[in-house]
Amino acid sequence: VSKQRVAQHATSKGGRGARQRILDAAAELFYREGINATGVERLAAESSVSKRTLYQHFSSKAAVVEEYLRSIEQRVANPAAAVGQTPRERLLAVFDTPTAGGAPLRGCPFHNAAVEAAGGMPGVQEIVRATKRNFADGLTELARQAGAARPRLLGNQLAVLYEGAAALATSLDDSSSWAQARTAAETLIDQAIASRK
């Protein structure tokens, strides 16, 4: 067997790329099926790696969950990082209806992780808390930029509204709660800006 064939086999099954395949499979499985419902065997199989290779990259399933959350954190953690819109538009964009493509709505991956990790994965819980705080801080910063009289209050109200919309959409598998939340957000934002004038 040539060295090239051995290298190709190592790359396709383990080796370089294995860590990313594990994280990609984790993102799909943890979100769609849940963290606790996804066993290490299934995660390894979906990643096309052995359990041994999985454990060479991650010390435990909790470590996989932590890295999965860190890998998606930047996409959702700070709404103030969005560009190309006014602060008010960026606040409202948080409430755009997510598209599930026919799949069941699963809500916020960080909320889901908090529920599934309760008491058993302190590292996961800390990542979730930090992400949720950063999210609320981002909303507060946008509220300040939009001219809200009390930006911290508005940021916290919008964070609670977001969590409620995500939870209700997930519970009912119905995205209409996002439109209702957006309408409520418009009212809150406009009142907060008007009260400053």
In which residue ranges do the predicted regions lie?
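Basic, helix-initiating cap at the start of DNA-binding domains
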Residues: 1-33, 37-49, 62-63
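Amphipathic, non-transmembrane alpha-helical scaffold segments
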Residues: 15, 23, 65, 69, ...
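Hydrophobic packing within well-folded, soluble alpha/beta domains
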Residues: 22, 26, 40-43, 54, ...
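Base-recognition residues in the alpha-helical recognition helix of bacterial helix-turn-helix
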Residues: 31, 41, 52-59, 67, ...
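Hydrophobic alpha-helical connector segments
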Residues: 67, 78-106, 155-158
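Amphipathic alpha-helical packing segments from all-alpha helical-bundle domains
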Residues: 81, 89-93, 121-145, 156, ...
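Amphipathic alpha-helical segments used for helix-helix packing
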Residues: 102-126
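Hydrophobic alpha-helical segments that form the core
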Residues: 150-171, 180-188
